[in-house]
Each structure stands twice: as C-alpha cells, then as structure tokens.
Amino acid sequence: MRRLRSVWAFAAAVLAVTTWGRVELRWTEAPALPGIGVLLPFAGVSNGRVLLAGGSNFPNRPPAEGGKRHLCDEIYALDPSAADPAWTLVGRLASPAGQGGSATVPAGVVCVGGLDAGGQPTGKSFLLSWQDGRTVIRPLPDLPAAAKEPAVAAHGSVAYVASGDRVWRLDTADGSSGWQELDRLPEAIAGAKAAVQNVPFQRTALFVFGDRVGYALTVAPVAERGWRRVELPLKVPAAAPLAVGDQHILFFGGFPFTNAVSCYHTVTDRMFDYATATGLPKLGQAVLRLPDGRILSATGEVAAGVRTPECFVGTFARTKSWHWVNYAIVVLYFAAMAFMGFWFMRRNRNADDYFKGGGRLPWWVVSLSIYATMFSSITFLSIPALTYVSDCRYFGICFGIIVLAPVVVKWYLPFFRRLNLTSAYEYLEVRFNLACRLFASAAFILFMIARTAIVTYLPAIALSAVIGIDVNVSIVVVTAITILYCTLGGVEAVIWSDFVQSVILILGTVAIYVFLVCGTDGGWSGFVSMGSAAGKFRVFDFALDWTKPVFWVTFVGGVVANLASYTSDQCVVQRYMTTPDEKGAAKSILFNGVLSFLNCIVFFTIGVAIWTFYRSNPQLLDVTMAKNDAVFPLFIGNDLPAGVSGVILAAVAAATMSTLSANLNAAASAFTTDFYKRLVLRNRTVEQSEQSEQSNNRLLRCGKICTVVTGLLGGGFALVLANMEVYSIYDQFQRFLGVLTGGLGCLFFMGIFLKRVNAVGATAGLVANYAVCFALDQTAFAGKPHLLLYGALGMTACLVVAPIASALTRRPDDGKPLEKQK
C-alpha cells in the first residue's frame, strides 16, 4: 500500500509541473458601427453577411440628464470576408424597433419582440435575410404575448423564445406552423438570456439563464418534458451567452458593466472565469459567430445610457505547442514499423508464408494480434468519449466476447483449421456453393475498403486536433506507412507489429489512467465518489425498453456484433490459421476474450476518469472542441507531460495501424484466394498448378498488388471524407456496415448449425436479413428499436426464412455430412 501511495504521489507531482495547454480568445478591433451605437439590436448572419438592425440609444443627452430613448430602424450589413470590411446601410425596418431578441437560422435572422415605435412591448416577429445583394424582410407569426427583451436562441431551423416564465418554439422551415408553447419555466426570469448547446447522453438542450440560476430543457434528438435546474456559481446578469464548440457556453459582459468572460461547461455542469475582454462593450452588445468561426462583439453599452459604436472580433488561439520530444517519439515509432516490414520480407518464401505466416507464430502473439485488430482507433477514442458524456450502460456489449469465445473455440475453429482455409469464405463454397463464397468475399473486400477509410479518417481528425498537422497529410502518412510494412512483410509482419502495438496500447492506457485519477480532486476517492454521485458507473439497467441502451439491449447487440466479427471477418479468421496447431489457436481466442473484457473495463472507467478530471479542472478543457470524440485526444495532447503525450499518441497510431494492416492483408487474402486462385489458377495446367513455384509467385504477387490497391482506395476515400461533411455520412455508413456484416455472420451460423439449410435457403435468409435491417435503419416510427438490435432482428428474420426456403427447395444431397459435400 505504501508503494502504491508513492506511485500516486509521484504521478501527482509530475502532473503538477505540467504546462497545461489553453485556448485563448484574442480580440482585435473591427470596423465601428456608424453613429453612436445602439443597445440590444437585432443581429445575426445570413448568406455570409452580418446583419444588424434596430436597437435603442440616447442621441441627444444621457438618461441621467433627461435624455429620451430613441428607437432605430436602420439595417446595416458587414461582409467579414472582404479585404477592407465596413458597415454599410442597406435598408430600414418597417418601423423603429429595439430591445428585442434575435437568433440565426439557415433562412436568415429571426427577430422577435422588443419595443415598437411607441415604446410599448410587442410580440411582432420577422425574418431578416440577405438575398441577391439586398435585405429581405419576411413576416413571421406574432408571439402569443408581448415580450420586451426576450431570450432568443436557435437550433437548426427552430427558434426558441423565452419571456417571463413562458417559452415558445417556431420552425422557420415550416411556413404553415405558428409558435408552439413549451413547458413553462419553474419561475419567471426577468432579463433572461438563452442558448442551445449539447448536454450529456448525446442530447441537445435549450438553456434559459437568469442571475444565479438557469434551466435546461432537452430539445433534440427528441424533445422531452420538464426543465432541469442549472446552478450558476458566477453571477452573469444580462450577460450575452454564446454557444461555442460542442459543450461550452461563453458569457460576455453583463451587469454591472463588467468586461469578464465566463464559461459554462454543460457536460460536467461547471462554470469558471474564462478571460477578461478589456475594451469590449459590456452590456446589451450583439455577440455572434462569424462564418469563419470567429466571434463578433458589436456595439452595446459601456456605462448607464452610454452607447458605443465600437466592434471587436475574437479569434481562438492556442498558447502551447507540442513538445519536440513528442514528435521524435511518433517519428521513431513509424520508422520502427517500416523497418519491421523489411525485416519480415526476408522470411516470405511463398504464399503460405505471406498469408498464414507459415503457421509458425506463437499463440500468445496471435492472441495479442487479435486483440489489437479488434481494438481499433475508433474504439480507443469512442469508448472513453461515450462514457465521458453518458455512463457505462454500453458496457453490456463487452460481455459478448466472453460468451462467444468458448462457442467459437468449440464449433467454429475446428471447421476453419481442419479445412486448412486461407480465406474464411472457402468454407461457404464447401457448405453451400461457389456463388455464396464469391458474394461473401466480394462484400467483405468492399467492407475493408470502407473500414480502411473510416479508421484512417477518424484518427486523422484526432491527430490534427492534437498536433495541428493537416488532416490530409495525416491520412497520407498513416496510409503509406501501413501499406509499406503490410505489403512487404505479409501477415507475419502484421501480427508481430500488432503484438508491439498491443503492448503500447496497454502501457499507454495505464499511464492515462494514473494521470487522470491523480488530476481529479481527491485522487482515487474523489474519482469514485464523484463518479458514483453522478451515476457514471451505472452498468445494469434492466428496464424493459428496447429503444434505449439498457443492459439486455447492449448484451444482445454485443453478442450479435461479436458473432459476426469472430466467425465471418477474414481479419480475425485469418489469424486462426497462423498458429502451429488448433490448440494454440484456441488459447489465442480465449486469452484474447479475457484481455478484451478487461480492456473494456479499463476504457469505460477511463471515460469516467476524463469526466471527473475535467469536472475538477473545467478551465483545462478546449472550449473550441468541435465534437465529443475529440475529448480524449485533446487530453492526450494538452494535459499530459512531454514524452508521455508522445507515447500515448503513438498508441493511437498503433490502434489505427493495427486495424489498417489487418484490413489490407485480409482483403488481399480474400481476393487472392477466392477470386484469383479459385477462378484463374484453377484452370491452369498441372505444371502451373498451385503446388508449383510459379503459381506461388503469382499468388504472392497478386496479394501484394491487392494490398496496395486496397490501401490506396481506402486512403483515397478517407481523403474524400476529410474534405466534406462527414458526421452524418459516418453514422449512416456505420449502420450500413453493421447490417451487411451481420448478414455474413448469418451465413456461417447457418452453415455450421443448420445442416438442412441449402444454398437457396441461405440466399433467401440473407435477403430477409437485409430487408429487415435496412427497413429499421431507413424508417422512423414510434418505439423504434435501438440501433444495437438491428443486427439481432435481421438475424432472427434470416434464421426463420432460411429453413423454410430450404424445405421448399430441398435436393437429395442437402443435409449430408460436410465431408461428403466436398
């Protein structure tokens, strides 16, 4: 125990001297608004133009000297991308108006409430937009009640307005709908401000802030009932809120005329002082995001009744660069992987060496290779990020491999080993027919190209966020190095490199865990108590609700997903052939199952540790973080000491390259064995048969060419993804991969366990599987099952249809023992 305490103390000391990375908001002067400035104008962005309209001021004398408030009707436009930007008077409102609220939607700027020309509160609303070089004003339905200084925010095309204790929503994309009233706030809030930002459990909420208190209401992906109270330890009365990044809300200025910038983090429910914005307007200013991501603070009030025309532009800038030691470690790692490819190239004398490593690899090396293959960079980044933003309920997926490992060893492994298969899909021809084999192999190769692209693209985003290199450069480097050592070294280089990468992954995760817990208030006890109080350790939720990730949903989904991976994925099945005997392969599967389960425990708790760390240190978070999946790599890059950060990033690269190398070699193996060898070499003469040296050379050459082509296609697709909107594409593509992979798992399951299913029945079952999965994926309806159940429901349909179709089309030889069907 004393030694353990010493380790914690040492880690805490190292952590204490670390220079933490920060993102600062740096301000520069922008063109001033003509005139003396206004308070609470309507402001937003439309088609690249900043539009600012209305507002109020005291043009003659300040209110303390008897001055009268003047409402404005001018509309100004600013092109922030121009070489010499300036505010231009581009139109006027139908009548003077001011002290209302506004928010930007895709169609323009929603302007709501305020004071009318007579100085009376109004419920009028309109849409202000910039079209064809001029302003366009389109009337919107009136609010059900007048609202002076309403709180306005937007999410997509939907605008939200809060006034007093009443809240409304309007979908500006639906011209036929009017304002719809939502649940009332628990209390009336005078001078409220609003913002929309992401919250835990992958939801989006509307926030309405008052003085020391705020309330949040979930509005997406599904609107929920009931407001949640948000405590604000820092006073922000009348401060202008602005949602930034994926999880932060900044508050600018406020009463009594402060120039402070505060920040609220929605996931950890923490608020802190972010910066001081000297010289900026302090109250009633227009604060908005420009098209290029910068922040504009325009006009407002600097003292009671004293307006200012001054405008400022804020730019986020990093204050810390990555240490050269980290770069050196990453470069050495990539160089070592390339050297490994050259080293094992000398051992490849034939196709059997290239694709199966000559069957001479130790079981413990193969086991860690399977672990590294299944534990991709997506897993490395997404599991901690998922737990950080929610809880541990998805842990039920991890029980799947524990349940399936003995099943694979007892029933699946003997088939693959005794048939001495290079490609997993050779079995499908023996069991069903050639068409099933070719279909499965072709589908698998397409899966590998797509998976290569996704697995390359996502870590490239992470590397770009950490060290600032261009995403495209990162994709090219990772793809090139992986193709090099995979092409030269074959599967033996892949497996030994996977072994090295597994060691890096395991040691790296231990280091991360130590630093996260040491950086949490209270250390280990603080980590446990803080996580428990927030429900972050919740695993077992036995609610009978198939629309949510309750335990039985995640467990069933995990079993089906692992069934497909460990029985029909060439990446994994190929490794069963690389040990000297079946006993060694069985050991590798069982050991990998235990290791993977323990690894899940570590990475799910790392997600909790990230949450407790940033709840203790919210000021260390990057407020510009664009997506939740970036939280882990940003911690690695910003909050770990030099050297340690480089080793961990090498672990991220290891996870990426493990999956990529497995994908490339498996795709080459499938194409060479199922297409080239089966369809081309089989028709050759005896002298050029597969036993000849010439035939082996051809297989080896074909495998290397296919490895390069698959890598180039995958890398090219990754470059396409990097230069377009990819979030929805990635989500949809993941579902697509899951549907088709589950179908292949069905084929192998029926082949081994359903002896009377013939080729016609198997095909009919696959059609039923795809029909169910695609229908679930592409349709929306009340009570729709959770995504994790799509594969299970598709497999159920397959297992029902296939036996029926086989019974209707049975031939005399159907159902005979496998060896008699050869």
Label each residue range with its predicted role.
Residues 18, 158-162, 208-210, 251-253, ...:
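Short, intrinsically disordered, charge-balanced linker/junction segments flanking boundaries
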Residues 21-322:
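Kelch-like beta-propeller repeat domains
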